[in-house]
Amino acid sequence: QDPQRQLAEMARSKSAAAKKAALVGQGDLFAPADPAPAAAAPVADDEEVDETDALPAEPEMESAQTTPHDYRIVRTADELRAMIAEIRRYPEFCFDTETTRFDLFNDRIVGMSFAVVPHEAWYVPCDERSTPEYAGLLRPLFEDETIAKIGQNIKFDLMVLRRIGLAVRGPKYDTMILHYLLDPESRHNMNALAAKYLNYKPIEIETLIGRGPRQLTMDLVGVERVAQYAAPDAAVTLRFKRALL
């Protein structure tokens, strides 16, 4: 066979094989195409992802309604004597006063609350008849210099007690001043301290006396309702002192 013809046939054979190989690599053009991977859904430019879903939920604040407690109303002189005897077993006690309004020079005391352990407190209602007798029974306790006294904005309470003839002696702790010394830039009222240190929401005084021109005076509110407000204040203030020192 002519050598040139043989070379031509070999060339044509290689060309056909190459084309076949190329077609095999491409696959069948008429076969169903493999499904393409699903594309991610586009996010609109103005659509924001809520990152707070991944954050832990804020703990619900405690309150007098949700926290186990023992708040008692002292209604007689004998019950007051028993309360005083119990308080004397402790090295310190917290106290708070309630007045008709917030005018030190014209208001009248309505009651006092006392606490020596967290979540427990007494409320002692005071009227014009009982105040002199109760003040006489409480005088040795307030004048005892071996027992520390605790209050929130205690200067107000000291002045209220002075008006009914009670002098307060011994060590005194004011949680408002304590917090000012630790964190002078923050707020120091009871609601702020309760939220910050105890995750607790005190009862608002407006829930008892209202607000505005029709606001009541505290002596017009029932003793039970005042006790629900005043007793927790003493117990919470005691917890402030132990959290701050």
For the regions a protein language model found, what residue spans apply to each?
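Long, highly charged low-complexity segments
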Residues: Q1-D107, M112, D127-L141
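Active-site-proximal helix-loop-helix substrate-binding element of RNase H-like nuclease domains
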Residues: E58, E62-Y71, D103, D107-L245
